[in-house]
Amino acid sequence: MQKSYLGIKLFGSKGNQKLFFEKVDALQKEINNFIFYLVIAGTETSQIQGISAAGIDSKARRRTALADAEFLLFGAYKDHKYKLPFLNSGVTPALISYVCKKLICASQIVVPIGIKEKPYFSHLTVENYLAGPAKCLTTGKSMNKERVLSLYKKGLEIGKSTKQPIFISESVPGGTTTAQAVMEAFGLNVNNLIGSSLINAPRALKTKVIKAGLLKANLKNNFDSLDVISSVGDPFQAFSLGLLIGARLAKQSVVLSGGSQMLAVILLALEFIDSTEKQEFIDLVFIATTGWLVKDNSLGDLLDLITEKHNVNLLGLASPLNFKSSKFKELSDYEIGYVKEGVGAGGMSILAFLKGFSNEEIVSSCQVNLERMKDLGQISINKDC
């Protein structure tokens, strides 16, 4: 029987009822203490036609992460600078995260990396914005090793200095493709296990792109996680790897809110740390995502592949949030497989449920804010934004 608490469900075969309730209880106790990071990052991999639904076209995808961050910080308001990109179906998951953020009284720290534009809003600078996005992974040289190491060290420093549990979310167009590339670089066959923001994941296209990148990367024996990120990864992975490891060195809990992109960071960390410390490292790490993503693909199987490879006990938590009652097509589209996750929607909604808010309250607030977004013209009505 699938374990659940307040509708929150467990995924991953190594989970058991005792561990599940221990994890949920630990999260519930920490809700008011988290430091929330939204890492927005750029990779030219997102410019491949058909690779991502995070924007209707390649031009839109260049600003998707900035628009997501702006909305998460401020919600719907008339003085917005970035229009949320037009989507054929659904709406940005930043809407869910914003609503839940307000409900649980959280505040986010935005970390822009490789965005090519300095945000006007408050943010944490970890490198010069002129560094630009990572190259397309088909080059086999996404970023130079020095940049990867620098981002890793910045994350590590911030993580080690933290005195509170941390929550990591992301907005990285093209990020599920770089996540898959990282996993395949370490020998995992995951092509049929990786989801997508698209209703039908472009598996054949991703396979072609990743094969080309790994062939050109020509990773030699004894390569490490930083080599893999340098070859086929993205800036989010480099920084978040350091942030995760640093926070665990500081004995803090870490919530990784997302799907395959967060599991890629877990894999990178397990490949990087000392083999004798892996279970202790993973004990206070949480993978939190939406129920839509778990339903859409074999995320539990993907998690199991990683835990079996490294002989650790890691479980995932899936949010019970649903839009079955919504009168808005943009929201009900989630129920048929569009968008699914992003910007920490799964983890943020789990925290809202744990704080006592109901599905109806979250849905109602999402609908109110969606109407405001439309009234204020915050969603582009054009296919070219």
UniProtKB/Swiss-Prot annotation:
It holds the Pfam family DBI_PRT. InterPro entries: Nict_dMeBzImd_PRibTrfase, Nict_dMeBzImd_PRibTrfase_arc, Nict_dMeBzImd_PRibTrfase_sf. Gene3D superfamilies: 3.40.50.10210. One of its GO terms (molecular function) is nicotinate-nucleotide-dimethylbenzimidazole phosphoribosyltransferase activity. Belongs to the UPF0284 family. The lineage of its organism: Bacteria, Bacillati, Cyanobacteriota, Cyanophyceae, Synechococcales. Transmembrane segments: none annotated. It comes from the Bacteria. It comes from Prochlorococcus marinus subsp. pastoris (strain CCMP1986 / NIES-2087 / MED4). This is UPF0284 protein PMM0439.
